[in-house]
Amino acid sequence: MEAVIANILQQLGFDSMTKAAEASFVEAVDKYLRNSFRELALHTQLSKHTIPTTKDVALWLNLLNIPMSSLQTELEKYLKPLPPAINDELDRLANESQDIPSKFKSSLDSKMVSQLLGSLAVSQNRPAYVVNHLPPFPASHTYMATPVYPVRPTSPKQIRELATQESRLAEHALRKILNVNQPRSADSPRHASFEKACSELNLDVSSFHLVNWESQKWSSQR
């Protein structure tokens, strides 16, 4: 890797570099290559391949913003003359890398697809805050704009149904409030034991309001 970095810097017009700069370049290039090859492995798995194919590599380079035409210039520096097979393959990939593979192409004609899905034109009305290097917006049939505020119902039948549903919810909430406010019966075993202990000690049960309240609170409702 040091030799590759030195060759690149020499082509850019640098004659020498320090050890610290070399270490920084090696670390940066190593990190970049690891992340790039990890993305290539993901594209290969998504294509259900065990080994990256030419299509996978072409798609990977396009996503990295590396044009296929630049590879031919780099290969000409090290392969002189460039083999015709490699040259033809690069030309073919440069022209077909953006095309849809035949296995994913629709069997319907474009007119029928337009009738089924609507307009397939890509919206180019890019807002000012969208930078240019981002991909274009998808076709209009792939997403649907939803209103921010819900539309109020206008049908009388639907309004009556919603009112009935809300009244039932209110009635259910009132019943729960009334059930909670009803006094609970003090028939728990703990309360009976408490009354027995008070009678044995000649104490008045009504004088222990806090204990009596707690026993009523935690008694199970029947």
Swiss-Prot record:
Query: Chief localization class?
Result: nucleus
InterPro entries recorded: Histone-fold, TAF8, TFIID_su8_C
Superkingdom of origin organism: Eukaryota
Q: Which GO terms describe its molecular function?
A: protein heterodimerization activity; RNA polymerase II general transcription initiation factor activity
Is-annotated flag, keyword Nucleus?
yes
Q: Name one Pfam family in it.
A: TAF8_C
Gene Ontology terms describing biological process: transcription by RNA polymerase II; transcription initiation at RNA polymerase II promoter
List, alphabetically, the CDD domains matched.
HFD_SF (cd00076), TAF8 (cd08049)
One of the record's GO cellular component terms? transcription factor TFIID complex
* Compartments where located: Nucleus
* UniProt-listed Gene3D superfamilies: Histone, subunit A (1.10.20.10)
Give UniProt keywords alphabetically: Nucleus, Transcription, Transcription regulation
What PANTHER family does the database record attribute to this sequence? Answer: TRANSCRIPTION INITIATION FACTOR TFIID SUBUNIT 8
Q: What does the protein in this record do? A: Functions as a component of the DNA-binding general transcription factor complex TFIID. Binding of TFIID to a promoter (with or without TATA element) is the initial step in pre-initiation complex (PIC) formation. TFIID plays a key role in the regulation of gene expression by RNA polymerase II through different activities such as transcription activator interaction, core promoter recognition and selectivity, TFIIA and TFIIB interaction, chromatin modification, facilitation of DNA opening and initiation of transcription.
Q: Which family does it belong to?
A: Belongs to the TAF8 family.
- Quaternary structure note: TFIID is composed of TATA binding protein (TBP) and a number of TBP-associated factors (TAFs).
Instruction: Please identify the protein, giving its name as recorded.
Output: Transcription initiation factor TFIID subunit 8
User: What species does this protein belong to?
Assistant: Schizosaccharomyces pombe (strain 972 / ATCC 24843) (Fission yeast)
